């Protein structure tokens, strides 16, 4: 299976650089994964596609203000993308610099001195030497880390709009994009309809933007991300399945979390890292349907939806979306695959 099989041509003007005024004003492409039937809807129509007895699983991870700036003691400028916080004074980060900082050197993160303890590939381990911790630095100076394809700096509204309304657990460096469409009003409508809701956590790493760089899909090594699938979520899933309801995931992060926890065919609580890679030929043990945005060509995420719905059906759906001028990627429109 070749990575090029998952390529498609996207007109640049269809990349959504800005969100719509209202979260739930986006469009929704409905794809039947059995028949390949495609239909166009508004996102607010999603309420009509779910039933009492179904379970919606959301990822409650919160995007960090993970982009920070600083300098070497020489004054040379540095740019940071915080990847993972080990404790308030110790964290892993990417550093953009003309010349990489040496292990053992001291550098500034904004106005605070930090020591470079280690480097592994492009990832640095830093320990803050000053009084402030990384949470304080992000709160005071941090920027929302918009993806490179938006080709713009973050603006004030991004702090709210690049975040879901139910975000709770700080730790992601990218938005849970399928969840961005859910307004507080729509969440209330879902509850009022008698549809159950559950929350898992997967902290999205910067590897989500990493293109697949090998020719053979099976050779790709996924980045690891931290997930939590609690006991009560597993109980809800088992109950839903027993009662004939559907488990509907909001976003590929929720898919990867549940399929990690259900790898042995039975959903079990899971706390730790996952590097699960779902591509055509892989089996889904838990997920019955999903809401997901439109994904980058040749990405692991377009491979995931192709595994769920069949590659030819996905490519046809994407071609339809392009012809109908859907908006793509993080701030773009969504699909409901069932």
UniProtKB/Swiss-Prot annotation:
Q: What GO biological process terms does the UniProt entry carry, in alphabetical order?
A: queuosine biosynthetic process; tRNA wobble guanine modification
Q: InterPro entries of this UniProt entry?
A: QueA, QueA_dom1, QueA_dom2, QueA_sf
Q: What is its main location?
A: cytoplasm
Q: Which GO terms describe its cellular component?
A: cytoplasm
Q: What Gene3D superfamilies is this protein classified in?
A: QueA-like (3.40.1780.10)
Keyword field:
Cytoplasm, Queuosine biosynthesis, S-adenosyl-L-methionine, Transferase
GO molecular function terms listed in the Swiss-Prot or TrEMBL record: S-adenosylmethionine:tRNA ribosyltransferase-isomerase activity
Protein's cellular compartments: Cytoplasm
**Family per similarity comment:** Belongs to the QueA family.
Q: What role does it play?
A: Transfers and isomerizes the ribose moiety from AdoMet to the 7-aminomethyl group of 7-deazaguanine (preQ1-tRNA) to give epoxyqueuosine (oQ-tRNA).
Q: What is this protein called?
A: S-adenosylmethionine:tRNA ribosyltransferase-isomerase
Q: Which organism is it from?
A: Francisella tularensis subsp. holarctica (strain LVS)
Q: Which gene encodes it?
A: queA
């Amino acid at each position: 299976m070749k990575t090029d099989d998952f390529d498609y041509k996207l007109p640049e003007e269809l990349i959504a650089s800005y969100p719509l005024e209202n979260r739930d004003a986006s469009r929704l492409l409905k794809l039947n994964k059995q028949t390949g039937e495609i239909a166009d809807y508004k996102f607010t129509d999603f309420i009509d596609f779910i039933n009492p007895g179904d379970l919606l699983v959301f990822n409650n991870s919160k995007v960090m203000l993970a982009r920070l700036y600083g300098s070497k003691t020489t004054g040379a400028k540095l740019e940071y993308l915080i990847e993972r916080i080990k404790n308030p004074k110790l964290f892993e980060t990417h550093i953009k610099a003309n010349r990489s900082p040496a292990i053992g050197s001291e550098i500034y993160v904004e106005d605070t001195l930090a020591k470079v303890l280690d480097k592994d590939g492009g990832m640095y381990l830093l320990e803050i030497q000053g009084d402030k911790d990384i949470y304080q630095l992000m709160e005071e100076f941090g920027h929302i880390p918009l993806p490179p394809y938006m080709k713009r700096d973050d603006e004030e509204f991004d702090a709210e709009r690049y975040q879901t309304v139910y975000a709770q657990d700080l730790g992601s460096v990218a938005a849970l994009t399928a969840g961005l469409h859910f307004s507080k009003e729509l969440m209330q409508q879902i509850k009022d309809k008698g549809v159950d809701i559950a929350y898992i956590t997967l902290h999205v790493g910067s590897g989500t933007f990493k293109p697949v760089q090998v020719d053979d899909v099976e050779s790709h090594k996924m980045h690891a991300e931290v997930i939590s699938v609690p006991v009560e979520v597993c109980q809800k899933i088992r109950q839903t399945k027993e009662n004939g309801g559907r488990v509907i995931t909001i976003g590929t992060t929720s898919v990867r979390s549940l399929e990690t926890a259900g790898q042995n065919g039975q959903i079990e609580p899971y706390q730790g890292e996952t590097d699960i890679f779902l591509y055509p030929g892989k089996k889904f043990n838990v997920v019955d349907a999903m809401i997901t945005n439109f994904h980058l060509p040749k990405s692991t995420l377009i491979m995931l939806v192709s595994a769920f719905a069949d590659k030819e059906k996905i490519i046809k759906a994407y071609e339809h979306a392009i012809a109908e001028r859907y908006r793509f990627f993080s701030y773009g429109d969504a699909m409901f695959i069932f």
